[in-house]
């Protein structure tokens, strides 16, 4: 008999609130049950009866929202959930994914007791194998992060692997990671249990009911049109899995949801002669591209091949997902890998090769959050084959988002608004997911880049820079230079170099940083988001004063660095705004803020024809001229004095540069170094760049990339949104008090929260760490997410890091918390608490001593000095 995993999911008729939306199946003479009418209205309509939809409904009901209707076009748990391999793993690279998986594990563990529905939950533990030292380093990094959030795990030897799972061939292993509290479970039964609990709380569930389109009125969800009638609603949740892309387009105001399906294979065997114990650990052999779990005394094994098969590009998929065509030739490499890992499987009979579609996203992270174009339209899809692991936690965070207006954790890395509509091209998605699926098990070293779907958005200078040796990375679909390879460097060797240690581009970036310090460098920063806000009267100033925390009522020409805060005082954006005229403002934000910031501004801006918001990102090429000789270059090109006396810091002027007029020149560089940003109308971009490079030759000019920018800004303790700052970070927690108009009597979003925080104190503080006993040439490098220890106790994680070429040390930024030794509760973090601690940074299990600083290193260190001449212990913040 086929396993429950493949069997038809049993009906849910025992649950209150459950409705069959179609006649009961039976013989021709059977009595047909009359169709049940849908409610005319509800607060929330959830589309999708898989683990995501049922989890959202479950958590909404737990948070007090009872007026919820869940609609499923087929049968509950009959989509991807039905074919899920049932592996619950907490070992993830991203902190938010670790937290979602940990919550899911705890939820599923108690679900059977809560609902009475057997879910097959069995705590087996997981073993993650390493065939190479680099893979072991990757596991050690994950191990360090899991331990500090309370998930037990350890690095083990091949001998220990053999003890935990005697059937495994361990001769080629260098080590492994054991996570003892991981589990296996029947995903379909978990979905049914969640649905049952939601139904008992008042959620109404209807299967065999298809949503035709989502009705929108004035940019707000108004209801849904189904094949059985309309339901008026305030909120709609798209948990449609395979069908989410098409359903998004069926809205009266289309919603872009970038995901694409690929075929996913796994096999099932009959039991061993002596059946495997139910507690047999799950095995993940990423180097072999396979996973293995116990299944009814035999095994279930699948993987992520190098040459995946995209499916449903045309959008034609079934009402319910069926087992797709077997393809043993395609599965053969995974089967060979499986037999190498478990040679005794050769004698075991295979029951079936399962082929089911799985959805993948352009960046390997799931998609959740509210649509930027339709208020009240929420999305939870694109699990990249981790739906079971993420289902509980993701459903909880999305429900919090809907009920409270924000989730309890920072979920920006999963937010739908990290994508633009341009990333929803079917051709782009088809090509990208063919890369994404194998990447799930590929070794990902720091600073790796996607290779597909590139050159989607480029600066007008792209070809010019590419010809000069630019190496590129992608951000929000935009190509940005990382660094520039000198003619004498081996390009192929550099591109293929992947390491957790000192990278091959180290000396290249060092020379770019040196040029920024001593001469002049040019960085193309055209990808930055650029908005203009104008009005006929004072409307622009009034709304911006409310939306931003710093005072924007400044003289024309001044630039203000400011946060855009939420009601909790957290950063929704961190940006610079130049006042171009009394009624016009120019706003510069991080690249990935383009969709998010636009949606936030439109959410609060009144419908006033006299107030205009325009996205001008594409209108301007941005050149960042950094270094002490920028004054000479621009003076020669503009015939205008550029000294600080004539052009003070944080000032904006419209000037002529070369033959081009209308160049917005700003005295800032985003690095703390002297220089200017040039915002150039795109038709003049090539001319201005050529003129700058030509005149700059006598001053030692060269191109530079974002790696140099990163080193400069981290060394100067400049925090960036999306890396160091997020929606939970407040200005008071990162030294930004001076950029908040708390005492000016002007109301703004987040003001009350900041006033309260100022009175109560902060519970975490952004801190700069300078590594002391770290050998740059021999030791593993810090990148981000490394645990921070104070006096031997865990207090936080790094958010970003870079080698400081001036300090000749690694510099990390991260948040320090003060956990009570007795209760573990968070306490106020003071400057004294920071300064009196002895700190260590954990890099893949090895702790390195570090000096903590609350302020940038004094300016005397801006000149290159020998490491032994710099006594960091004698340095004090300003």
UniProtKB/Swiss-Prot annotation:
**Targeting signal (transit peptide) range:** 1-26
**Record has Transit peptide as a keyword:** yes
Gene Ontology CC annotation, any one: cytoplasm
Keywords in alphabetical order? Mitochondrion, Transit peptide
Major localization listed first in the record, in broad terms: mitochondrion
Listed Gene3D superfamilies: Aminomethyltransferase beta-barrel domains, D-Amino Acid Oxidase, subunit A, domain 2, FAD/NAD(P)-binding domain, Probable tRNA modification gtpase trme, domain 1
An MF annotation (GO) of this entry: calcium-dependent protein serine/threonine phosphatase regulator activity
Q: According to the UniProt entry, where is the signal peptide? A: none
Compartments where found: Mitochondrion matrix
Give the protein family: Belongs to the GcvT family.
- Entry's PANTHER family? PYRUVATE DEHYDROGENASE PHOSPHATASE REGULATORY SUBUNIT, MITOCHONDRIAL, SARCOSINE DEHYDROGENASE-RELATED
**Self-association and partners:** Heterodimer of a catalytic (PDP1) and a regulatory (PDPR) subunit.
Function recorded in the entry: Decreases the sensitivity of PDP1 to magnesium ions, and this inhibition is reversed by the polyamine spermine.
Q: What is the protein's name according to its record?
A: Pyruvate dehydrogenase phosphatase regulatory subunit, mitochondrial
What species is given as this protein's source?
Bos taurus (Bovine)
């Amino acid at each position: 008999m086929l396993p429950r995993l493949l069997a038809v999911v049993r009906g849910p008729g025992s649950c209150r609130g459950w409705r069959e939306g179609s006649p009961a199946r039976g013989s021709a003479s059977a009595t047909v049950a009359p169709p049940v009418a849908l409610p005319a209205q509800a607060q929330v309509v959830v589309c999708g009866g898989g683990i995501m939809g049922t989890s959202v409904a479950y958590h909404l009901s737990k948070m007090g929202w009872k007026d919820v209707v869940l609609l499923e076009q087929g049968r509950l748990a009959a989509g991807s959930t039905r074919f899920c391999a049932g592996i619950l793993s907490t070992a993830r690279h991203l902190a938010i994914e670790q937290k979602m998986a940990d919550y899911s594990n705890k939820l599923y563990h108690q679900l059977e007791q809560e609902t009475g529905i057997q879910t097959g939950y069995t705590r087996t533990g997981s073993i993650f194998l390493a065939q190479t030292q680099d893979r072991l380093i990757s596991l050690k990094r994950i191990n360090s992060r899991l331990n500090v959030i309370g998930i037990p795990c350890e690095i083990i030897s091949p001998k220990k692997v053999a003890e935990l799972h005697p059937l495994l061939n361990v001769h080629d292993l260098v080590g492994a990671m054991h996570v003892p509290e991981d589990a296996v479970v029947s995903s379909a039964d978990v979905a049914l249990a969640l649905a049952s609990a939601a139904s008992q709380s008042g959620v109404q569930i209807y299967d065999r009911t298809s949503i035709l389109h989502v009705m929108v009125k004035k940019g707000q969800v108004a209801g849904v049109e189904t094949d059985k009638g309309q339901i008026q609603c305030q909120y709609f949740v798209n948990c449609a899995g395979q069908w989410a892309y098409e359903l998004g387009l069926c809205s009266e105001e289309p919603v872009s949801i970038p995901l694409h399906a690929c075929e996913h294979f796994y096999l099932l065997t009959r039991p061993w002669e002596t059946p495997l114990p139910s507690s047999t650990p799950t095995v993940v052999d990423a180097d072999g591209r396979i996973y293995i779990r116990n299944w009814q005394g035999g095994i279930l094994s699948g993987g992520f091949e190098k040459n995946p098969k995209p499916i449903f590009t045309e959008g034609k998929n079934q009402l319910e997902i069926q087992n797709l065509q077997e393809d043993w030739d395609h599965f053969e490499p995974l089967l060979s890998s499986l037999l190498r890992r478990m040679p005794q499987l050769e004698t075991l009979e295979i029951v079936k090769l399962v082929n089911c579609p799985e959805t993948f996203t352009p960046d390997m992270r799931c998609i959740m959050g509210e649509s930027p174009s339709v208020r009240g339209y929420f999305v939870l899809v694109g699990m990249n084959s981790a739906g079971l692991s993420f289902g509980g936690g993701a459903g909880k965070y999305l429900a919090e988002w809907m009920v409270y207006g924000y989730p309890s954790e920072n979920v920006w890395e999963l937010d739908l608004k990290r994508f633009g509509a341009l990333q929803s091209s079917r051709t782009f998605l088809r090509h990208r997911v063919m890369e994404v699926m194998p990447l799930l098990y590929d070794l990902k070293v720091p600073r790796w880049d996607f290779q597909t779907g590139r050159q989607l958005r480029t600066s007008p200078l792209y070809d010019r820079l590419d010809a000069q040796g630019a190496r590129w990375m992608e951000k929000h679909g935009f190509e940005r230079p990382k660094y520039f390879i000198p003619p004498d460097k081996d390009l192929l060797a550099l591109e293929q170099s992947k390491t957790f240690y000192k990278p091959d581009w180290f000396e290249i970036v060092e020379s770019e940083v040196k040029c920024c310090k001593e001469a002049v460098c040019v960085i193309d920063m055209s990808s930055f988001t650029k908005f203009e806000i104008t009005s006929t009267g004072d409307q622009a100033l009034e709304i911006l004063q409310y939306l931003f925390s710093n005072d924007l009522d400044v003289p024309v020409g001044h630039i203000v660095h400011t946060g855009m805060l939420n009601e909790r005082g957290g950063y929704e954006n961190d940006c610079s705004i130049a006042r171009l005229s009394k009624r016009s403002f120019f706003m510069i934000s991080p690249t990935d803020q383009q969709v998010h910031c636009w949606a936030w501004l439109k959410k609060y801006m009144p419908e006033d024809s006299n107030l205009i918001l325009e996205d001008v990102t594409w209108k301007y090429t941005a050149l960042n001229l950094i270094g002490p000789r920028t004054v000479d270059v621009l003076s020669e090109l503009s015939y205008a004095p550029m000294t600080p006396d004539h052009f003070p810091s944080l000032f904006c002027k419209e000037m002529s540069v070369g033959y081009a007029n209308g160049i917005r020149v700003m005295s800032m560089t985003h690095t703390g170094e002297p220089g200017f940003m040039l915002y150039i109308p795109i038709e003049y971009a090539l001319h201005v760049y050529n003129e700058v490079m030509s005149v700059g030759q006598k001053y030692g000019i060269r191109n530079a990339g974002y790696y140099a920018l990163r080193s400069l800004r981290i060394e100067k303790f400049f925090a960036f949104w999306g890396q160091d700052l997020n929606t939970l970070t407040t200005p008071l927690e990162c030294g930004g008090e001076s950029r908040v108009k708390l005492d000016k009597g002007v109301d703004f979003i987040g003001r009350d929260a900041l006033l309260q925080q100022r009175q109560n104190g902060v519970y975490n503080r952004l801190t700069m760490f300078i590594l002391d006993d770290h050998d740059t040439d021999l030791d593993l490098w810090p990148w981000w997410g490394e645990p921070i220890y104070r006096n031997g106790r865990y207090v936080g994680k790094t958010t970003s890091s870079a080698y400081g070429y001036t300090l000749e040390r690694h510099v990390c930024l991260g948040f320090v918390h003060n956990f009570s030794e007795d209760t573990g509760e968070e306490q106020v973090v003071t400057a004294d608490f920071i300064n009196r601690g002895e700190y260590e940074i954990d890099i893949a299990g090895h702790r390195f001593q570090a000096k903590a600083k609350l302020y940038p290193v004094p300016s005397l260190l801006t000149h290159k000095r020998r490491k032994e001449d710099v006594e960091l212990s004698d340095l004090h913040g300003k």
